[in-house]
């Protein structure tokens, strides 16, 4: 893939009023012919000026028109071919960036790059042949590192940046506006420009306080000579950056100072990206340092053609800013991009428009015919300029109408898809039930076939005995009655005479045949209700009429003769059924074997007499069908309306052709419904409704065909459209038009939608305008010629400094000395300029080094301060908090690249629930009760406060659980406790415990205190003393 460098041009503006009032001197000179820019240091007038060479250099006398025609024109032309392009202005605040990008409406020569790009894009679009374009515009700004949509409903809403593997970095939720001409683009630009953040500073009264990006997205649909479609996509980013500024010059304070800080940070990140791209040793490009660099990521070193316009101020008091701008612009020349044509984008909206236009034209062609459609489209003249201007007055209304139309189409499509899915699921369920019923019928047929074989075997034995007797009698009487042979017919002749009668019944055309299951059922189960409940199917009620007629054509009880006849008919009928619908036994029986079986096993005389008395069943069926058709005709003539419901595609339509055929065969051969309803009209209506609901088509049935014919005569057919199911790459079934019956569409709505879609795309309106095409080619040639002139001028400047001048022949030695003196002076000036450049670079590097070291020292001091504060604060953190372990918090933390901050765990306090320790304060509710009973209000209030304190103490688990209970009892302020356990002698504890003065409710609640150590040693003494006192009391006389 070929790479190209970033194109860089410089433009120097005239001095403004402020600079003229300060009597500033110009320090910038420009050589436009060679694309060189010179800047003189005002503090060192003896030093040579610094020289920079770019792709173009423009001074105060040049207009924006010349800049665009020479430099920007090839880049925008590439966008109309499928490339990505970016044009951005770079420079300090008040250097003319917005003037270069936006410009002035009057005079026309000072119009900016953005409006000229509009004209260029639509000029190329109108001149293109066999190509359609979809042009959409968006406008955003980056204010204080927040992305805002300047064309959205809420211009202050923050938008997020996302990254896509194919689209790259994009803004989620950014509004896109379809534009059709230059006027709409200018109106969109003006709307966004009014919403942009601007402010007043000392250097510029209308200073841009945000970076803005106007994007034009172009989708190109071209058809080559072979008729093959090609889809491409191009994108043009027109960037107007906010300028870097110094607070000392702009006087920014408060909100303006905050804005300036954010602007300088983003521009500094942009400069770091440029430096990293130029430096080949840098492996990491800091695109994520700013949202501006992320949005320009593809423009700097990616798949984009990029043009940088460096705007300069000629004043000497802006020398440092101008020199910095020139250095960054000179570095940007070395950035290599790899642009390529974006072919066949997957998310192209133009592809969807083209497919929908084709579909709508197909629908209209089916309704009106191709000739009428072309005539109608030709009569629809495009709106004139006045009408288009009227429509352009409300682009928001047009967008809302478009969104409403999209929503309507989406809802219609989802409803149709849901209906198709429901029908498909119903058909699948019906098919499952059909297979189950087929299996049940096969099992029943096998049982009946085995019974028939057993009966035929017994009959064969009886017939063999009869034949043996007849042969014996024939041998005896052959000689005597040879002349009277015709009077007695042998059985062989009788069999030959009877066989055509048997075989003539089943040998009918396949359209009126009776299946193998129908014949046995008709003879063995004459009751229609029983067989209906056993063999009927929901999706095949249309065969009810035929089965009813069959049950009436073969009446009679279940006899052996009927069983034998049904067996013969079933074996003969097997020639018209496929083998896959037969079981293991019936598949083995071929038509020849069936005939051989009939010939070898002739029925007895009794079955033959019954067969002779039977009528032709198929003739009776035909008669009943004729009566049915006449009844249906009479019902139609008597205005009995049969509702006609549009058919939905069945499961057979969603399968392969072979599957469709087998489904129809199964429906014809195996779906039997026996019924005996007398009301024919009701039966016909039910069949039509059930057929429309389930979508099962029984085309081979004679009565269904007749009912369909009657329905066609009664009501007109709806529009035939095309519906099929195709599967997209994501695995979703999408409905596409095929030949099925759908509801009629509104012709006016389809035509309006078609015209709306065709108006969305533009291209080729002026393809036959020779003047416009010639102008377009002339501007393209001018840009190429200007590029060649610049290359030639640079070569001439290199030749002037070459060694070929030494070949000149001098007339005298003095002339040679003067020539070499001039050459020496020139080389000395170059050497001095190089030394000054080296000195400036070293001083700049030294200043950056000092700045970096100062920043590192400041960060180290801040880090030490935070570390000391942390060491002092960490012991104060509770142990049950997760932040008491900072190493664990450090391991759990992670850096968020997108948002630029650390993700740290939330502070959590772990509470451990321990059992509550019973203390002496548990008897306070009793005292509260006594206080309440006594009716003292102040005591009641005091008890309430004591209860609150006791609860707070009990909740403090860490202080109460391991606290000594002895100390709390000793230090207890309860006078009752101190009186009972500490002030009394040990011998009186029992008497005090039994004291009647205490309330009885407090006695069991008072806890037993732990004894003192001295009391435990005095236990024997106390016992003896108690015994002695008892004796003394007992011995003393009362």
From Swiss-Prot:
User: What is the purpose of this protein?
Assistant: Dendrite-specific motor protein which, in association with the Apba1-containing complex (LIN-10-LIN-2-LIN-7 complex), transports vesicles containing N-methyl-D-aspartate (NMDA) receptor subunit NR2B along microtubules.
Q: Supply the source organism's classification.
A: Eukaryota, Metazoa, Chordata, Craniata, Vertebrata
InterPro entries to which the protein is assigned, alphabetical:
Kinesin-like_fam, Kinesin_motor_CS, Kinesin_motor_dom, Kinesin_motor_dom_sf, P-loop_NTPase
* GO molecular function, a single term: microtubule binding
What species was this sequence derived from? Answer: Mus musculus
Q: Where is the composition biased (Low complexity)?
A: 983-1000
| Tissue note | Highly expressed in the gray matter of the brain, especially in the hippocampus.
The name this protein goes by in its record: Kinesin-like protein KIF17
Q: Which coarse location class describes where this protein primarily resides?
A: cytoplasm
Please tell me one Gene Ontology term that the record gives under cellular component. photoreceptor outer segment
- Keyword annotations: ATP-binding, Cell projection, Coiled coil, Cytoplasm, Cytoskeleton, Microtubule, Motor protein, Nucleotide-binding, Protein transport, Transport
Q: Where is this region: Disordered?
A: 379-401, 503-559, 636-657, 916-940, 976-1038
């Amino acid at each position: 893939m070929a790479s190209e460098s970033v194109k860089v041009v410089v433009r120097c503006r005239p001095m403004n009023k402020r600079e003229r009032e300060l009597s500033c001197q110009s320090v910038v000179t420009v050589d436009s012919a060679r694309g060189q820019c010179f800047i003189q240091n005002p503090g060192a007038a003896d030093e040579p000026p610094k020289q920079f060479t770019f792709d173009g250099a423009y001074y105060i006398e040049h207009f924006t028109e010349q800049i665009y025609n020479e430099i920007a024109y090839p880049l925008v032309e590439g966008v109309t071919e499928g490339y990505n392009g970016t044009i951005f202005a770079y420079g300090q605040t008040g250097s003319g960036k917005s003037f270069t990008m936006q410009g002035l409406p009057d005079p026309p020569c000072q119009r900016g790059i953005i409006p000229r790009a509009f004209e260029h894009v639509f000029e190329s679009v109108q001149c293109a042949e066999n190509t359609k374009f979809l042009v959409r515009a968006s406008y955003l700004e980056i204010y204080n590192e927040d992305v805002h949509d300047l064309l959205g409903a809420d211009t202050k809403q923050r938008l997020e940046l996302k990254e896509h593997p194919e689209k790259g970095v994009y803004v989620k939720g950014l509004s896109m506006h379809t534009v059709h001409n230059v006027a709409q683009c200018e109106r969109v630009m003006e709307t966004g420009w009014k919403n942009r953040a601007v402010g007043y500073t000392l250097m510029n009264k209308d200073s841009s306080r945000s970076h803005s990006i106007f994007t034009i997205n172009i989708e190109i649909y071209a058809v080559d000579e072979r008729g093959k479609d090609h889809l491409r996509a191009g994108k043009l980013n027109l960037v107007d950056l906010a300028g870097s500024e110094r607070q000392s010059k702009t006087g920014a304070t408060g909100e303006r100072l905050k804005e300036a800080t954010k602007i300088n940070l983003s521009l500094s990140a942009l400069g770091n990206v440029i430096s990293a791209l130029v430096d080949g040793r840098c492996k990491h490009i800091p695109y994520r340092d700013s949202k501006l660099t992320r949005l320009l990521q593809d423009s700097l070193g990616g798949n984009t053609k990029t043009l940088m316009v460096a705007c300069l101020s000629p004043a000497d008091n802006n020398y440092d800013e101008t020199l910095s701008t020139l250095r960054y612009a000179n570095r940007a020349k070395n950035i290599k991009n790899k642009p390529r044509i974006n072919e066949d984008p997957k998310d192209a909206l133009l592809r969807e428009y083209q497919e929908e236009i084709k579909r709508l034209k197909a629908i209209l062609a089916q309704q009106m015919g191709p000739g009428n459609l072309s005539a109608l489209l030709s009569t629809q003249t495009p709106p004139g300029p006045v009408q288009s201007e009227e429509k352009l007055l409300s682009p928001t209304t047009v967008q809302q109408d478009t969104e409403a139309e999209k929503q309507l189409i989406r809802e219609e499509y989802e409803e149709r898809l849901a209906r198709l899915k429901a029908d498909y699921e119903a058909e699948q369920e019906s098919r499952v039930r059909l297979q189950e019923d087929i299996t049940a019928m096969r099992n029943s047929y096998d049982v009946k076939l085995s019974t028939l074989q057993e009966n035929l075997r017994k009959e064969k034995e009886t017939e063999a005995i009869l034949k043996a007797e007849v042969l014996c009698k024939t041998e005896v009487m052959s000689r005597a009655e040879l002349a009277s042979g015709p009077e007695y017919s042998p059985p062989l002749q009788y069999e030959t005479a009877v066989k055509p009668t048997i075989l003539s019944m089943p040998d009918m055309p396949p359209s009126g045949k009776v299946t193998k299951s129908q014949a046995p059922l008709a003879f063995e189960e004459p009751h229609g209700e029983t067989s209906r409940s056993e063999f009927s199917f929901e999706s095949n009620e249309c065969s009810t009429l035929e089965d009813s007629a069959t049950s009436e054509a073969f009446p009679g009880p279940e006899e052996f003769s009927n069983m034998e006849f049904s067996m013969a008919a079933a074996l003969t009928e097997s020639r018209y059924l496929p083998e896959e619908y037969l079981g293991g036994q019936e598949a083995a029986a071929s038509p020849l074997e069936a005939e051989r079986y009939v010939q070898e096993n002739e029925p007895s005389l009794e079955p033959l007499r019954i067969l002779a008395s039977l009528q032709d069943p198929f003739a009776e069926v035909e008669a009943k069908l004729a009566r049915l058709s006449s009844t249906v005709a009479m019902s139609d003539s008597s205005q009995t309306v049969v509702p006609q419901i549009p058919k939905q595609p069945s499961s057979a339509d969603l399968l392969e052709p072979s599957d469709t055929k087998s489904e129809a065969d199964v429906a014809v051969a195996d779906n039997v419904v026996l019924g005996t309803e007398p009301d024919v009209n009701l039966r016909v209506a039910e069949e039509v409704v059930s057929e429309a609901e389930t979508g099962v088509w029984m085309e081979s049935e004679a009565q269904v065909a007749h009912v369909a014919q009657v329905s066609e005569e009664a009501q007109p057919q709806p529009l035939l459209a095309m519906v099929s199911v195709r599967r997209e790459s994501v695995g979703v079934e999408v409905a596409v038009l095929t030949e099925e019956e759908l509801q009629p569409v509104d012709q006016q709505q389809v035509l309006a939608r078609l015209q709306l879609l065709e108006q969305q795309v533009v291209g080729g309106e002026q393809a036959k305008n020779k003047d416009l095409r010639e102008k377009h080619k002339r501007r393209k040639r001018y840009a190429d010629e200007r590029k060649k002139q610049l290359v030639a001028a640079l070569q001439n400047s290199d030749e002037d400094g070459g060694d070929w001048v030494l070949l000149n022949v001098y007339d005298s030695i003095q002339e040679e000395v003067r020539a070499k003196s001039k050459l020496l002076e020139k080389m000395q000036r170059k050497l001095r300029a190089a030394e000054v450049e080296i000195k400036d670079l070293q001083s700049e590097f030294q200043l950056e080094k000092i700045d970096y070291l100062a920043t590192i020292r400041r960060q180290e001091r801040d880090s030490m301060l935070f570390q000391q504060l942390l060491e002092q604060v960490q012991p104060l953190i509770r142990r049950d908090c997760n932040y008491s372990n900072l190493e664990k918090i450090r391991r759990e933390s992670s850096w968020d690249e997108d948002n630029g901050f650390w993700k740290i765990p939330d502070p959590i306090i772990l509470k451990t629930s321990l059992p509550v320790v019973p203390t002496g304060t548990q008897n306070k509710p009793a005292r509260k009760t006594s206080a309440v009973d006594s009716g003292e209000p102040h005591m009641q209030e005091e008890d309430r406060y004591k209860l609150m304190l006791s609860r707070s103490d009990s909740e403090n688990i860490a202080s109460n659980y391991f606290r000594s209970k002895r100390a709390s009892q000793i230090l207890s302020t309860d006078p009752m406790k101190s009186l009972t356990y500490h002030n009394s002698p040990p011998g009186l504890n029992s008497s005090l415990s039994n004291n009647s003065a205490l309330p009885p409710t407090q006695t069991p609640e008072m806890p037993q205190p732990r004894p003192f150590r001295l009391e435990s040693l005095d236990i024997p003494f106390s016992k003896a003393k108690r015994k002695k006192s008892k004796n003394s009391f007992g011995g003393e006389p009362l």
